Amino acid sequence: IDQPDDTSLHDCLSEREFQVMCFLAKGTPIKEIGKELFISERTVSTHRTRLLKKMEMKSNSELALYAYKNNLIE
């Protein structure tokens, strides 16, 4: 079954995973992301692991490229 054209890889992410993705794509360190979102570094790392798996990516660099190409970050 084909997916509709208007769906994106990031549509499968939770709101918090999406927030973490945007910070990671901008190169924000995990410690700073935790402070910004009021969550622990371990929780940030868990979100990172899950969102990379969901999006079938292996690195923050891939994430950054995706986010930039899809106008999710400036």
Predicted segments, located by residue:
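N-terminal regulatory/sensing modules of transcriptional regulators
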Residues: 1-4
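Recognition helix of helix-turn-helix DNA-binding domains
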Residues: 29-62
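Helix-turn-helix DNA-binding segment
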Residues: 6-41
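…primarily DNA-binding HTH/wHTH and HhH modules…
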Residues: 73-74
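Noncatalytic linker/hinge segments flanking ATPase motor cores
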Residues: 12, 63-64
